[in-house]
């Protein structure tokens, strides 16, 4: 026999908020709620509890919410008041929540809102949304396809917002911005966020720079070849990618931001086709960058097309936990150059106190390969 969900509808105001109307009800029995009007922090706290481990709330309809009284932090960590937003920490670890309909005029989603909602399925984002907080949908494996609105500008989809979650990204612009002849396929003076084969990118028209923002962590591809024309890999781009075994970087990609590749449990092979490679800081106020590739326990092979080790920043690989188990592959006649290359290290207390380390020898071995044959094999 099918059991009917216990449903409730509420019309809320500042004078009569949701948490007051729910105070005389047995909230643990309610499985579906529709809210119209006003929501505040106390309301979000109660809804989070109702959809958590001790609750039973499965479906939440906030479509007609037209005003909120809460604040989400901006990219500088400071509270920013908007007319309609989902509060910071709301619905974190709401493991009972299966479906949510967001407010029609929603402007911002806080951090780490919805993080750990392991049963939450597809969420439709309204066109009005212009900010998605850090780790907003962290570890939501059933999230599926995510639509990113054209209204979201650079920096407003914050770090790890969809880590270990989405299996595909779709934008209004869903094709590569340059054709085979190098001619632009877009119109206007900028194209911002765009998607290509389910991956999220950002493009700057004024300097023709293309950044890979986020690879969908739950996509079941085992091999991904980053499109030619991509120049920069952003922070958290390949975080918690559950199924990725091989990742190939094109000749155009020479900058990898710290924290770009982390927590990929099945990643075995990395291929870098560019003759030069460098890291990048997340915050320009930082003096140095680091931790570019971390926590990839099955990584066994790294292929570098660069013939000169001086053009490759060793720091990109420096934080590999299992470097002594990884084979470094370099072009023919280049192994000796890599083995003998020395990097200078200076004491932080005395600049004249220097030492020279043959850094590439930290790998398990350095072996040669022919890039021409490799390219013919599609790698």
Regions found by a protein language model. Name each.
Residues 261-262, 289, 293-294, 312-318:
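Predominantly extracellular/luminal carbohydrate-interaction, adhesion, and secreted-enzyme modules
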Residues 24, 50-51, 77, 91, ...:
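A general structural signal for stabilizing positions within well-ordered secondary structure
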Residues 5-13, 31-39, 55-84, 95-108, ...:
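Structural signature of tandem-repeat unit edges
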Residues 88-90, 110-113, 133-136, 158-161, ...:
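Consensus positions within tandem repeat domains that build extended binding/scaffold surfaces
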Residues 8-93, 205, 234-240, 262, ...:
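Surface-exposed repetitive/solenoidal architectures
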């Amino acid at each position: 026999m099918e059991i009917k969900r216990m449903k409730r509808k509420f019309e809320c105001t500042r004078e009569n908020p949701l948490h007051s109307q729910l105070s005389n009800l047995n909230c643990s029995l309610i499985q579906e709620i529709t809210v119209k009007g006003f929501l505040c922090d106390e309301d979000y706290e109660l809804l989070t509890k109702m959809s958590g481990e001790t609750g039973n709330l499965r479906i939440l309809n906030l479509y007609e919410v037209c005003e909120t009284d809460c604040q989400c932090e901006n990219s500088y960590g400071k509270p920013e008041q908007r007319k309609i937003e989902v509060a910071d920490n709301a619905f974190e670890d709401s493991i009972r929540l299966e479906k949510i309909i967001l407010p029609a005029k929603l402007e911002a989603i806080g951090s780490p809102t919805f993080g750990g909602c392991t049963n939450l399925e597809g969420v439709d984002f309204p066109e009005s949304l212009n900010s998605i907080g850090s780790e907003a949908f962290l570890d939501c494996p059933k999230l599926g396809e995510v639509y990113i609105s054209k209204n979201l500008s650079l920096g407003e989809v914050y770090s790890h917002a969809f880590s270990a979650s989405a299996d595909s990204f779709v934008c209004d612009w869903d094709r590569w911005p340059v054709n085979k002849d190098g001619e632009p396929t877009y119109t206007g003076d900028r194209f911002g966020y765009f998607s290509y084969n389910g991956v999220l990118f950002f493009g700057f028209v004024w300097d023709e720079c293309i950044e890979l923002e986020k690879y969908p962590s739950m996509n079941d591809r085992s091999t991904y070849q980053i499109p030619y024309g991509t120049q920069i890999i952003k922070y958290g781009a390949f975080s918690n990618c559950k199924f990725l075994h091989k990742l190939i970087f094109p000749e155009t990609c020479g900058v990898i931001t710290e924290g770009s590749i982390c927590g990929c449990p099945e990643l075995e092979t990395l291929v870098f086709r560019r003759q030069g490679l460098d890291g990048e800081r997340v915050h320009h106020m930082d003096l140095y960058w680091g931790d570019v590739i971390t926590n990839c326990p099955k990584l066994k092979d790294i292929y570098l097309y660069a013939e000169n080790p001086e053009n490759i920043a060793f720091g990109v690989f420096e934080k590999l936990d299992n470097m002594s188990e990884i084979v470094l592959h370099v072009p023919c006649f280049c192994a000796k150059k890599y083995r003998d290359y020395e990097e200078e290290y200076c004491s932080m207390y005395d600049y004249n106190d220097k030492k020279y380390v043959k850094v590439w020898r930290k790998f398990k071995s350095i072996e040669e390969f022919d890039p021409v044959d490799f390219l013919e094999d599609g790698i």
